Amino acid sequence: MTDRVTVGNLRVAPVLYDFINNEALPGTDIDPDTFWSGVDKVVADLTPRNQDLLARRDDLQAQIDRWHRARVIGGFEPEDYKQFLTDIGYLEPEPADFSITTAGVDDEITTTAGPQLVVPILNARFALNAANARWGSLYDALYGTDVISDEGGAEAGSGYNPVRGDKVIAYARRFLDGAVPLASGSWSDITGLKLDEGQLAATLDDGGTVGLGTPEQFVGYLGDAEAPTAVLLVNNGLHIEILIDAEAPIGATDKAGIKDVVLESAITTIMDFEDSVAAVDADDKVLGYRNWLGLNRGDLAEEVSKGGKTFTRVLNSDRTYTAANPGPDGATELTLPGRSLLFVRNVGHLMTNDAIVDAQGNEIPEGIQDALFTSLIGIHGLRTGDGNGPLVNSRTGSIYIVKPKMHGPDEVAFTCELFSRVEDVLGLPQNTLKVGIMDEERRTTLNLKACIKAAADRVVFINTGFLDRTGDEIHTSMDAGPMIRKGAMKSTEWIAAYENQNVDIGLETGFSGRAQIGKGMWAMTDLMADMVEQKIGQPRAGATTAWVPSPTAATLHAMHYHEVDVFAVHNELAGTRRGTVDQLLTIPLAKELAWAPEEIREEVDNNCQSILGYVVRWIDAGVGCSKVPDIHDVALMEDRATLRISSQLLANWLRHGVITEEDVKASLRRMAAVVDEQNAADPDFRPMAPDPDGSIAFQAAQELILSGADQPNGYTEPILHRRRREFKAASNVG
């Protein structure tokens, strides 16, 4: 790119400069020259600090590599290892007890436990669907997934199957019995709903009525009191809307005329600029920034074709009901948010992007760019009116930013300093920008309490990320010896300690009722029955939120937060610390290399297939998050985190002679044919197997494995970005 706009010491891509000046700045009351001058100063002051932190990562890794190489034969004592990490500053002293002081945070984060979506910001349709997933039909979620079995003639089919529909209704009634029980009997027995002297009354077959076991769970309704069209209930802070219409197709089959049960579902959503997107240049970044602007202004729209019809999808409005009881101010209406509360995930400290270069042509850190531009855009989510759009995101004046891939408290402190400088540029009060800390790197896990302390007045979220965290676990100890197989990682000692410690330190530092404690993604997008059975373990473990791959999954996962009162779990866990540093330092090394040749081949093939299936869409289609069938054709929601663990495991096995370079190359060639076949129905797919040497995607996958041990902290972004740019240049893709 040769044509750039000069801004002080910076050279800005015209597509970005024009977007900021013509679209993002109007409505913020910020002068363009003042803004760009501030950008120039922040970049000049903080880029060297960013580079120093990355150099510190490399230095620590080099010291750890040397330490392990000196002991790879004789092994080492855990206490010696722990002392070494302390001596080099990798393991830092834990601070004295404290509580976070974050203020001005929305209820969705502080006092509401529920599902969290993560979606790629480059896809406007996905972003709209996620923002609108605050409310979801339980009937649809059940009918369209394997939560309802096909047994007894209940197959989904192409048209409505009343046998399946009856199963859905029965399941929903059982859910209501658990979440909002009647004073006696079952929701399955009712024939109607009405108000009786301001209280909800359910009519029964014999003409009698029964109220709720806890009358306060009734909070609002729509329509006439004698024949409401909707009834609003609440349990554990989450709302349930029962829709009534005896003439609707489903309501007509229900003796109570109930046509649907709608659950408050995706309470919060992360709009992602990081692991789920392929944004490698100025054009990609501006596409994401423009979608983020539309979400904050409330005017994002997308043409959608469904069932042979085309319509425009927009953001949902808030929902207003007649209140069951007048509010403190005498208000007779109850208004609830119609949309998920939005976070934005910036990129980490590692990557740069050519959207802005300095006077010498060096790309500037992408994380600094994201902080400046996503925060500027976030101002629109704090206001309504001319220039800001009709909707707000935060009702408390905060902009929520998830910051990933931070290594230790110094990097968290740097993020907070960056946010403070951005607030100065934007004229925002200090601590407007809140931070979500991803606990997904080993040095952050080991120093989690110190990381939280570094952001004590900004932090609104800590979250475990098993895949990235495992990738860093492997890379940090790359030279210690061969690691166990990928599937065995979830049952290791350090993983259990990691998941428990995150909750315990969150509670210890005052997160309950003030900030989110989150847990990771359910990746098997089509296996919703398994999710409903298993994912309840996360709220039971104290998580106030956990990641889901779709709006449907959000609605199903919401049921878990009705069954589990997470804040009661917090009271039970308070004062405990279940994970120890010694457990966290237990490296997942294979005790002995007792794998049979076919087991090794299976592991290599599984990982190579996973890598190719993800990378080919990343490189050729610019898709950073998608359902990728595994070697057994089970659809998995994959992003860069899954790629990191797979490539790092194979790099580790290569390092220690478990496999050879030729084993990897042969597996990649075999698996390329498998991935080609899995994508055969896609007319735009470019097969890899016929010419692997000519496939940039294939070469990228191979490089990720063969060069995996040399990648900074095992990250995949440097290779992916370079190869995607190569593909775009070769294909004239904009």
Swiss-Prot record:
Residues annotated to bind Mg(2+): E440, D468
> What UniProt keywords apply to this chain's record, in alphabetical order?
Cytoplasm, Glyoxylate bypass, Magnesium, Metal-binding, Oxidation, Transferase, Tricarboxylic acid cycle
Q: Which GO terms describe its cellular component?
A: cytosol
Q: Which residues bind acetyl-CoA?
A: V118, R125, F126, S276, R313, P549
Q: Which residues carry this modification: Cysteine sulfenic acid (-SOH)?
A: C625
The protein's annotated pathway:
Carbohydrate metabolism; glyoxylate cycle; (S)-malate from isocitrate: step 2/2
| Subunit (UniProt) | Monomer.
This protein is called Malate synthase G
Biological source species: Mycolicibacterium vanbaalenii (strain DSM 7251 / JCM 13017 / BCRC 16820 / KCTC 9966 / NRRL B-24157 / PYR-1) (Mycobacterium vanbaalenii)
